[in-house]
Amino acid sequence: MNRKNIFLEYVWLDGYETPNLRSKTKVVKVWDGNFPIWNFDGSSTRQAPGNDSECLLNPVRSYTWSNNHYIVLCEVLKSDGSPHESNSRASLRQLESNFKDEKYWWGFEQEYFLKKDGIPLG
């Protein structure tokens, strides 16, 4: 039986002042459909010192890229499982829990500037 490799691409924000996207890919032949917590060296992403560099990637959302490739969005945890300082999702969860009885909504906004020919700049 010829099995395709399954690619699980874990994506997270690093610890730089202006965060960058980072990723690493796990290739598996047998997959149970779950996205396990995975570790990475946080010293290379400004998320841990060199002498204690293990950080954890906690999957929070996944998207199918193709029939055998998944994008796995992650939040960063410290090696003890607590939220890392760069983990803005944890801050948002805390804020949301303070207002759980309120009716609120939030969203993202992206602005564009159009040239005279109707093409976005950049």
Located regions from the model:
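Glycine-rich, acidic/polar active-site loops that bind/position phosphate-bearing ligands
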Residues: 1-122
